[in-house]
Amino acid sequence: WEDAALVSLHGRKENLMAVIKENKKVFALVSNAEEIRQILTKMTEYGMGEVTVRIGTELSYKNEEIQTGTARSLLHYKGENLAVLYIENESGGENPVIPAIPDDTFVRGDVPMTKEEVRSISIAKLKIKKDAVVYDVGAGTGSISVEAAMVATQGNVYAIEQKVEAQELIRENARRMHVDNLHVIEGMAPEALEELPAPDCVFIGGSKGKLYEILDAIRKKNPFVRVVLNAISLETMMQVLKYTEENEIEEAEVIQVAVSRAKKVGSYHMMNGQNPIYVISFTSRPAKKEADPENEDDFVLEEINLDEVEPEDMTGDIVEDITK
């Protein structure tokens, strides 16, 4: 069992779907039957209903009991004691470290989606850590949200989207990709961000004309937030650069991504170009503050060791005071 993942869900939340997806063997300590049913229901909804599950209660005691079945077949489990789940997922751990999910894997409908190559670069520029809190503002189909959730396996991703159709697509894509640390926030930024935890990384795919307000809101929550934006127009790119200059943020990195894909035409192949996209990224810094002469807290007094100071380095007043 040295290759099994050990997870305790007793009194805390864990992104169990991601753990199951990444490992062939998972031991999970759970609190009660209701929590077990919730886990089995979510596994079934996320396409893992046929994964083998063993539920052990009162282990090592005379009344020890172990039930074995698939997640789907055990949906109505009724035991009430503290239990251990042992989950065997034969396809666990087969996903690449960097997701790079093909475009046709996502359910799209009529909602715009960040394409695969641009998405991979944007995710890399976000510099997401495993326990990161990530915002995807204007999430669309949730393609960025899903890949971010695959990287931040111990964190949480918040997909902010106002359109009902897109909200349902995000939920569907989260289920298809087995990520349960992705949360759909219904509404428009910046108002929809108010109750969310402070972000480590923010991707902005759409701002509905409120770009500056969104940037102000996320920087207020975390002055050191990492930001990545996708833009089609020069005007949007210039807006971002103007904002970084006016707010004394480090200079933004701007790259243009122009992707062409081979397309078969008869017996030949020709390159079919996609629209070029600007990928803009920067790490926020707190705005510099002018010292207020009326506020003592704006000034720092430096302690001086007088034994290390030569008299000729001092002003006359200080020398006079010391030598008295």
Role assignments for model-derived ranges:
Residues F224-I232:
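Conserved beta-strand signature within the Rossmann-like core of class I S-adenosyl-L-methionine
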